[in-house]
């Protein structure tokens, strides 16, 4: 009788976990479809980059439309206003005049400036490795490339990204706190003024 009850319990657990997996997969599919149809996307992020022997902090704005994307430094004040363009479907940065050498965090091009385009690319077409609920947020782990995994925390109600971790070489290299997320037909370009 114990074996029978144990077997039934295991089957129920597997069925229940499968239902939750479908829920996260559906949320992932809906998010990708929503971002694919959005004409524009903009947000601000406080980014913390973890180098081998130092930590660097930036406040960056991101804006994307049919012509591509743009990352602009809002802080630190010393480099505020430096921006880079990203062609549609790419994560390679093209600087407008000034080149900002923030240093790469891995051998595959991850840097503080490239982190936001890489995150957006993962949100659009990254494969979902896992999904769970944590502190009232929906969390998805997305495999962006063979080398990059993005873990993103969303508000459960509308799947708005709130924070993200970008992991490469087995460790988290970039932390991002996301605010002012706007998507749709024509969100305003982010305010590029600094305080």
Residue positions per predicted region:
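Sec-dependent bacterial lipoprotein signal peptides
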Residues: 1-17
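N-terminal leader/targeting segments and the immediate start of mature chains
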Residues: 13-65, 185-195
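Short linear motifs in intrinsically disordered
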Residues: 33-37, 81-85, 129-131, 151-157
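Flexible, processing/modification-adjacent segments and terminal tails
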Residues: 36, 47, 93-148
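One face of beta-strands
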Residues: 41-47, 54-73, 82-84, 91, ...
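Hydrophobic lipid-interacting interfaces of membrane-associated proteins
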Residues: 48-52, 76-78, 98, 147, ...
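An acidic-aromatic
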Residues: 63-118, 172-174
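Gly/Pro-enriched, hydrophobic low-complexity segments
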Residues: 130-195
């Amino acid at each position: 009788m114990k074996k029978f009850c144990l077997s039934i319990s295991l089957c129920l657990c597997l069925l229940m976990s499968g239902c939750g997996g479908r829920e996260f997969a559906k949320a992932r599919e809906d998010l990708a479809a929503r971002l694919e149809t959005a004409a524009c996307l903009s947000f601000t992020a406080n980014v913390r980059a973890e180098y081998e022997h130092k930590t660097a902090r930036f406040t960056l704005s991101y804006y994307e439309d049919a012509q591509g994307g743009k990352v602009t430094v809002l802080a630190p004040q010393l480099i505020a206003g430096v921006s880079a363009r990203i062609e549609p479907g790419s994560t390679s940065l093209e600087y407008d005049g000034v080149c900002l050498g923030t240093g790469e965090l891995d051998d595959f091009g991850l840097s503080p400036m490239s982190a936001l385009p890489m995150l957006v690319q993962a949100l659009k077409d990254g494969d979902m490795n896992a999904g769970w609920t944590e502190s009232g947020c929906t969390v998805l782990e997305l495999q962006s490339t063979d080398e990059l995994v993005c873990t993103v925390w969303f508000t459960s109600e509308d799947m708005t990204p709130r924070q993200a971790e970008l992991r490469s070489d087995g460790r988290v290299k970039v932390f991002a706190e996301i605010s002012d997320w706007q998507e749709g037909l024509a969100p305003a370009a982010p305010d590029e003024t600094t305080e």
